[in-house]
Amino acid sequence: MPSTAWSGAEASAPEQPAWLDSGNSVGKRVDALLQEMTLPEKVGQMDQQLVTTLTDADGGRCGDFGFNMPNTECMQKILIEQQTGSILAGGTNNPPDTTGKGGIGNTGEDWANEYNTIQSFAIQNSRLHIPVIFGVDAVHGFGHPWQAPLFPQSIGMGATWDTGAALTGGAMTAKATKATGWTWVFAPVQDLARDNRWGRTYETWAEQPVLASALGAANVKGLQTARGGQHSLGVAATVKHFAGYSQSINGHDRNEALLPLSYLQSTILPSYIAGIDAGAETVMVNSGSINSVPATASHYLLTDILRGQLGFKGVVISDYQDVPALQTAYHITPDLSGAIAKAVNAGVDMSMQVFDAAGWQTAALQAVQSGAISQDRIDEAVRRILTLKFNLGLFDQPCMKDYSKPCVDASAANDAVTSGRAEALKAAQESITLLRNQNNVLPLAADSNVVVTGPSADSMTNQLGGWSVSWQGVFDSGHVCCMGDPKQIPPGSTVLTGIQAANSNAVYARDQASALAASSASAYVVAVGEKAYAEGLGDNPAPALPPDQQALIAALQVTGKPVIVVVLAGRPVGLGPAATADAVLMAYQGSTEAGEAVADVLFGKVNPSGKLPISWPTDAAKVGGDFDGTAPSPLGDQPKFFDQLTGTGSGPGHAYNPLYPFGFGLSYTTFQHSELKVPSRMSANGSGTVRFKVTNTGTVDGTDIVPVYVNRPIGDTVTPTQRLVAFTRVAVKAGESKMVSVRFKASALGETAGDIDASGPPTVQPGDYVLQLNKNTTTPYEVDLSAKFTVN
């Protein structure tokens, strides 16, 4: 095997390697490079290490968790000797100031400079000049650089029911990350929000497969079509966490799920499928286990279903430390070599090993040399990884052809990273969900004497949640773990500053005593909710407003003045006395611009249009149930998956009877639906167009979100009372009407047919169905209009 000695100065020479010739096809370039690679070089491509392994810790070891730049010795060790092919920026891995201008670091320019340092070293010093691929969690915008505008967390984006907003959010994220070189984005989360206790609920779009599918697919397209130059990809999107990650039996992160295969096929898989069908280049694996088999070691999940049934062709990556966890946590193998063999043979192409490049290299080579992993399987995985790198243009960066040039233009990175503020504001405005508005207390008069109070009134930390500047969020002294630099507070508007900008009469009361002492108050705006958290640190057996927040609301209610509660949270929470407040707004963790958006709604500049993408339980002790549940839960302490069937004698406690149902949200106007028209017949592999009229019967222009549901009166298997099959957003001026057309595929009616052991893909059963539009009330399944149709 030749030892290639090409250098950047020789880029135009005829003898340059075929894989560096941009005139060749990607397939030809991959073939040429793969043929030249040694086995250690190949297994190195299958490993992803934390960026901090490239920095020097005390005592000369590589692996500092501080905020230092990579150094030559550690880059040599990890990138050249261990031949690591991918680098991860973990939740706390923000770069220091790299400009020499005395800044506080963690800007777009700093991220680009860090990338240039690492990438140039890898390209110039590796035998075959193979660039590294850089991965980062960017779940609601480029969440690391402190100056970047952030979008609402995904559950808030779900409340917009706006695929355009999801696409724009992806495109703005891609613009920012691509400008800094970090072109592998670990988003979107396509898990379903079916258990409020789970600490990652806010990272999901919705509890419903159709809504999550539509938004996730749009987000993938936004991420991957920010085109630049000759390459088709903006950045690589990652559908995660395949599959069923959110379904743990106890609401804890990275835990066991018990999933009937029919439920997996008909309910859990569709949202992942939508992201894959939208073109997602990569898939990340569920960290938990399903039916006692770790997903990372499941050939059935990662090969039979993902590759065979779904036809996925891209890269499969494990989540953080999940391959070694097969040995250390799941105990299904005695050593790391065995863990690697199980994961790779199941279908994992790259391991997010993060800490131990040498351990990966040694154990992976042992697995191949012992025959536990075949050379063909290694080549298959590396071929996928190299294809991704070529598609992203990593082999055609300026620094590949001329070592004196940077890989990305760091001087342009800040502009790209800080763009998107107007788009984030629009998404926040669309997300806000009005849950209660007694006696039309809202909107408030623009000059009203508003008193703003509550622990989340002036907290960018609580407003943004996790994955914002740092893993556990923006710095706040009340938190204990893993937050950003206290100097790095993102620019934007809190609820307080947003209200004060809109109303010069507004005053801030820091605590209950000062709020009660504000005798001139005409209304109280109380901003409450959750503190920032991420992953398992957010798991909560009974999510609810804390006692001090509930006490504040109750004390203000005694004054007799209007109390408007603004909830800033990543999931529905038990409201306590807030449930009887004069008005309740759910603002989610609503972006850096959420304060302005809240003020726009409070004072009537914006008519709220958001609708719940997730059911809101009656109290914190209940998980809430799912809108499309079908049967009592078989899981003991989990009334989370299913509704109680009528008349089965188990009492009302397990019925779908939330405080606010899926799809609910009020407006400052009223809408009427009429003239519903549905095709009388539909092919099982076809689609149909639903038509109806929307009339704005109020005095304010507004946007109506209309979910379209289907009921199957009789069938061979138990089906939900209603299934969401489509939805639309329609803007209608006061007093006007619009005819609306909504198209849906018959495949949305699919179910896994057969007996208890059924496990195949969903099929559409012939028979009679009823299409339904619901009333916008707190009563579940209250039908407004309906029409029958037949599938044949």
PLM-predicted stretches and their roles:
Residues 4-756, 761-779:
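Glycoside hydrolase catalytic-domain context in secreted enzymes
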Residues 779-792:
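Short beta-strand elements
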